[in-house]
Amino acid sequence: MTPWYLYLIRTADNKLYTGITTDVERRYQQHQSGKGAKALRGKGELTLAFSAPVGDRSLALRAEYRVKQLTKRQKERLVAEGAGFAELLSSLQTPKIKSD
């Protein structure tokens, strides 16, 4: 099974784009060449700010959603220190128990 990664790309105007992929370098090159997400087209120079393995596709999708809900400040802490990423992944892996 191919591992999935969560990544953040910083645009020239200092915004952070969050995505998932199985190959961070390939996906980053797609974004650089304008063949990636429309949200990044025409945004100037792009830099890969953060990437980390997250597991399978399902977990990667949940992690992407969760990171997209973070504030800019929280995303900046994640980029700078990896702050809270292990806890975020742990919370996504913990099975939820339904109560009646």
Swiss-Prot record:
Pfam families recorded: GIY-YIG (PF01541)
Annotated GIY-YIG domain residues: 2-77
SMART domains found in the cross-reference section: GIYc (SM00465)
Family of this protein: Belongs to the UPF0213 family.
PANTHER family: UPF0213 PROTEIN YHBQ
Protein name (Swiss-Prot/TrEMBL): UPF0213 protein YhbQ
Organism from which the protein derives: Escherichia coli O8 (strain IAI1)
